[in-house]
Amino acid sequence: MALPILLDCDPGHDDAIAIVLALASPELDVKAITSSAGNQTPEKTLRNVLRMLTLLNRTDIPVASGAVKPLMRNLIIADNVHGESGLDGPALPEPTFAPQNCTAVELMAKTLRESEEPVTIVSTGPQTNVALLLNSHPELHSKIARIVIMGGAMGLGNWTPAAEFNIYVDPEAAEIVFQSGIPVVMAGLDVTHKAQIHVEDTERFRAIGNPVSTIVAELLDFFLEYHKDEKWGFVGAPLHDPCTIAWLLKPELFTTVERWVGVETQGKYTQGMTVVDYYYLTGNKPNATVMVDVDRQGFVDLLADRLKFYA
């Protein structure tokens, strides 16, 4: 039976490809998609969810727009990475359907209530919507199987020296998620920076030759440009968000450790840092499954295989 999931995202090139991967995978049942501000403004990320679902002919999936700003901070966006639209590069269709007349939290709560089995939440943007759900609906915690997030890092940040972008945008929300008592799976930069898509991988996707694989290749063409900066030392573009979906589909591609994770919300230099107790120094019980490595070729092969679904 397919695993029910709720996808909360802020498209974003890698979020868009995570949607493509999830909807090409019969092992997953995407119950709803909610949007958050992050990679672009809330209006643009919502529009990008609708555009992607229009492209994929999945306008049956309920969509709702989430929080317009973090819990306690002003919004930061990553338009320098994702462009003016949030999905610059390919020509995407205009949305042919409208979002639900409710908030992201209301749609999430409704989806959890109506599900006969616990639902996995996959969150590939800032954790604002998920934190609001957890705080406003404690009675639904038991309906959440796990929360799989793209965010954080054991080591170096990508937005500040200490912090990864998604966590930095709303560290208070991320701390609520990690300390919720619900199982958390963390795909941080330690693994996503190894999940790089090289130019030859993009050409492999393009050669599959269907409209969706072509769009994915064009998204990657644009996404690669930002990551060519020598400071990163990358061969390709790190495909952060699809690691969450890939872990659900093929956990054997990933190396994980069980550790306690906390989020720094006060630090002078370290706000938004995910503090991973790798050496068990705090005495805190592990609260997260932390991805630390990936079989890059296996990850690329999975993407290529699933893109054929759209023929």
From Swiss-Prot:
Domain of life: Bacteria
Any one GO MF annotation of this record: purine nucleosidase activity
Enzyme class of the recorded protein, top EC level: hydrolase
Database matches in SUPFAM superfamilies: Nucleoside hydrolase
Enzyme Commission number(s) from the entry: 3.2.-.-
Catalytic center residues: H240
HAMAP family for this protein: Pyrim_hydro_RihA
NCBIfam families attached to this UniProt entry: PRK10443.1
Family statement: Belongs to the IUNH family. RihA subfamily.
Function: Hydrolyzes with equal efficiency cytidine or uridine to ribose and cytosine or uracil, respectively.
Name of the protein described by the UniProt record: Pyrimidine-specific ribonucleoside hydrolase RihA
Organism: Escherichia coli O1:K1 / APEC
